[in-house]
Amino acid sequence: MDDAPTTKPLTLERALGRVFAELRESRGLKQVDVSVATGYVERTVGMVERGEKSPTLRTMENFAAFYGVPLETIIVKAKQLRQASMTPKGQHA
């Protein structure tokens, strides 16, 4: 039996993007809503959420403030997602 993960481990950028996308979706918002509220162009919001663009600390702070979530919480969640993506199925980190 192969214990290797079936998918490639998440990069930190992709993990952060997933957290930001989950925050947006859980609030019933679209990327354009985040764009208008934060001043970032919609394309940038999408690229960050897909992990195609590494957000600056300022961008992460602005998104965190918009969602009303401490940046530390977002970083911890992203690290947990990333770690889970590197853990073989059936095992716990």
Where on the chain are the PLM-derived regions?
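Recognition helix of helix-turn-helix/homeodomain-like DNA-binding domains
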Residues: 39-55
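A short, Lys/Arg-rich alpha-helix, primarily the initiator
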Residues: 1-26
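Helix-turn-helix/winged-helix DNA-binding modules
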Residues: 15, 26, 52-55, 66
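DNA major-groove recognition helix of helix-turn-helix/homeodomain DNA-binding modules
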Residues: 5, 39, 58-73
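Conserved hydrophobic/aromatic packing and binding residues within compact polymer-binding modules
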Residues: 20, 34-35, 45-48, 74
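Short basic helix-loop element that most often maps to the first helix and adjoining turn
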Residues: 18-37, 62, 89-90
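Short, charged recognition helix plus adjacent turn
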Residues: 2-5, 65, 75-93
